[in-house]
Amino acid sequence: MRVLLVGGGGREHAIGEALARGGAELYVVSKHKNPGLARISRDYGISKETDVEKVVRFARMWNVDLAFIGPEAPLEAGIVNALEREGIPTVGPTKEAARLETNKAWAREFMERNDIPGRKLFKVFDDVEEMKAWIDEYGKPVVVKPLGLTGGKGVKVVGYQLKDNEEAKEYAEYLIKKDGKVLIEERTDGVEFTFQVFSDGRNVIPMPLVQDYPHAYEGDVGPITGGMGSYSCSNHILPFITKEDWKMALRTLEETIKAMRKEGYPYKGILYGQFMLSREGPVIIEYNARFGDPEAINVLSILEDNLVEIAEGIVKGRVRGAKFQEKATVVKYLAPKGYPENPIRGAEIMVNEEAIKEEGAKIVYASVDENMKLLGSRALAMVGVADTLEEAEKIAEAGIRHVRGPVFYRKDVGTKESIEKRIRTMKELGKEFEPNSC
């Protein structure tokens, strides 16, 4: 089967590997040639992923049978609508269904309309004075969000990126002046986790839970990034999540898919719920209309079933299930020094792939070109898969020793200490639970 993959980051390298394992003849379109994808694809087109017409031209030229969309920006640009008009079934939501991610105010209003469990108190403002008065009256810490896509970097939280509600009002005023509107939400305290599912518009197939490390530096400090790494456990749940929490989070995603169908926007593709586990249970922080990056790398590294068959099930409305190995995974991203604010670009990195393989680790390429030159975003990810989290983390660390160049990474991703910190956070918030082993 000829499959078009749109996107050239680490997430897409992981998707491409899984499609190739499933027997796909792979064709890729992305804005730069990912060296990992270049090796496994039959042909490679260079284009902005949001240039819908150009992507469609490549798809027609290659006569593809199926398309799989990696990143969010082309979804917002209507790439699924355009490919399906050409008769090419596509894994990914339409422009209208992708609003769950691309329009945060629409997503919150959708949750409210449909009584989706796990939702937060929110308000959308286009008037500066009204916004300030509401924040003053509310009185508790808030979260300030731009309405559109920000790559995870535009959200600011009081007590973290913002000192207090006064600073929140200043940032919200800036966003109203820039974008015309702003989303204000209650702050929810707890620990974040990622729950990804496959959906054909009706059926919802859960994947293992993953936890991401969004901050740039060790100890969860520094600017928010696209994600510096992530881990998953062999039991497919996380140490601080109870079976009841898992069921509640899954119900939120199932109710979301059901309500999307009811509203006339059947959701076909991957839905990613970014949850905050609060003392009362899981609360949805935001939806993403595609795989997470890095979280895709964790789950696809242990997918036992054929991704091509799952993709066919999604587009034909008959996805039945997905089996995953009972293994732990650790993904550590290496990023250019200075990332995310002022990254080094153009410098070369040296990667000893043979030595990495001997360590039992796996490499996933992202923002590097075919000459291993840094392009400015996260460069590559090192993946460890093992029976225990401790072993998986050691494998990823061992692989990193064979990469040279002006890059940095978070040594604490997937470590026992960092996970114990998250368990402590939940206990300090008053949540009663017995931690799962990982």
From Swiss-Prot:
One GO term of the biological process aspect: purine nucleobase biosynthetic process
Binding site for Mn(2+) 1: 274, 286
Catalytic reactions on record: 5-phospho-beta-D-ribosylamine + glycine + ATP = N(1)-(5-phospho-beta-D-ribosyl)glycinamide + ADP + phosphate + H(+)
Keyword Manganese part of the UniProt annotation: yes
Keywords noted in UniProt: ATP-binding, Ligase, Magnesium, Manganese, Metal-binding, Nucleotide-binding, Purine biosynthesis
EC numbers on record: 6.3.4.13
Highest taxon listed in the record's lineage: Archaea
Span of domain ATP-grasp: 108-316
Positions of Mn(2+) 2 binding: 286, 288
HAMAP family xref list: GARS
Stated name of the protein: Phosphoribosylamine--glycine ligase
Originating species: Pyrococcus abyssi (strain GE5 / Orsay)
Gene (name only): purD
